[in-house]
């Protein structure tokens, strides 16, 4: 029996990432009819609302919780979803938290790219393989740009929003791997078990997104 099957059909468990996406996600879900409010700042990681349990997770863990049925649905960036490799249902592009995953190098740097630093080894490997670049990939956790500035790597692959951090550190984008926005993801078993709750939520979110000004 999966975790999704142990809960009552009328109760939803949602996985949302801590940080920049959380507030926009809660606001959008509330507009879609769920009785949610922004959780108070505390050490609590699980928040209870009428008919809904909200789990605050690290970005990378949202697809895992949804795929394994601990959460019925969640919201996560497309970049995280692709890197996870998890096979979850992705019904709605929510069109916020827009950014791009880019290949970045110090301005004026010359020579071949032999080592690449990144938090996204899966996406980076696919990109390099497709172009026949046999570079070593170094998996890093934070301050990715520093790898290019210190010589740890010849280039880095990281998310870019405005590009201001790159300009401030004499870095430039060489190529864009893909563009990313926040996505609604749903556990496939939960979609059947909680159809009466998840289908209306999906349709309401689609309508809200379509009616947002471009």
Swiss-Prot record:
Coiled coil: none annotated. PROSITE patterns: ATP_P_PHORIBOSYLTR. It comes from the Bacteria. Pathway: Amino-acid biosynthesis; L-histidine biosynthesis; L-histidine from 5-phospho-alpha-D-ribose 1-diphosphate: step 1/9. GO terms for molecular function: ATP binding; ATP phosphoribosyltransferase activity. It is an enzyme of class 2 (transferase). CDD domains: PBP2_HisGs (cd13595). InterPro entries: ATP_PRibTrfase_cat, ATP_PRibTrfase_CS, ATP_PRibTrfase_HisG, ATP_PRibTrfase_HisG_short. It is found in: Cytoplasm. Signal peptide: none annotated. It catalyses: 1-(5-phospho-beta-D-ribosyl)-ATP + diphosphate = 5-phospho-alpha-D-ribose 1-diphosphate + ATP. One of its GO terms (biological process) is L-histidine biosynthetic process. GO terms for cellular component: cytoplasm. Belongs to the ATP phosphoribosyltransferase family. Short subfamily. Lacks the C-terminal regulatory region which is replaced by HisZ. This is ATP phosphoribosyltransferase. It comes from Deinococcus deserti (strain DSM 17065 / CIP 109153 / LMG 22923 / VCD115). The lineage of its organism: Bacteria, Thermotogati, Deinococcota, Deinococci, Deinococcales.
